[in-house]
Amino acid sequence: KAGRDYSYPAIVKMAERATPFRRFVNPDDPRFANPPSMTEAIKAYCRETGQPEPVEDDEFIRCIFESLAFRYKEVLALLSEMAPFPIRKLHVIGGGSMNNLLNQFTANVINMPVVAGPSEATAIGNCMVQARAAGLVADRWEMRRLINSFLSPAVFLPEGSGEWEEAFRKYKSVTSKK
C-alpha cells in the first residue's frame, strides 16, 4: 500500500544487506494479521518493546525474515515435544520453499537441515491422490518415490549456529514482553 513494488530477488538482496539481529517481532501477534499498514504495525511493535524502529525497507524485510525463522524454531520445538519420533530436518513446501534466504535463516536457527520444495506441492499432491484413486500408484511410499524421481529439493545446512542461538535468546526476550 506504500506504493513500492519490488521483485522477490530484490527483496532478498535488500534483506541480505541489512544489519542482522537489530529488531524482532512475533509474527503471530494479532496486530500483524491484516493491519492497515504493516510498516506502521512493525514500528509500533518495536517501539513498545524498546527496540530501534526500522526506517529503510531493507530493515523491515530483514526483521520479518529473521522473526519468521525464529518463530519456526519455537513451533518446531512444540512439534518435537508431541512427535513420537525425533525430528531431524524440516521440509518447507509451497511458495515459501523458493525463498532461499529465509530457508537458510531457518536452517541456521533450528540447527538442522531444511529441505525446500516442491513449490507446487498442492498441485503435485492433488495429482498423486488422483493417481492413487485411479490405481496408478499403490501407496504413499510409491507416490513419494515418483515425486522424488523428477524433483530435486534444495537442501540448506546450518551455518553460524552460535550467533543465531544468541540472537534467538534476544528474540525470546523481546517477544516475551508482549
What are these regions (language model features)?
Residues 1-89, 98-122, 128-178:
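Active-site core segments that coordinate phosphate-bearing ligands/cofactors
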Residues 95:
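Glycine- and other small-residue-rich loops at beta-strand/loop junctions that grip anionic moieties
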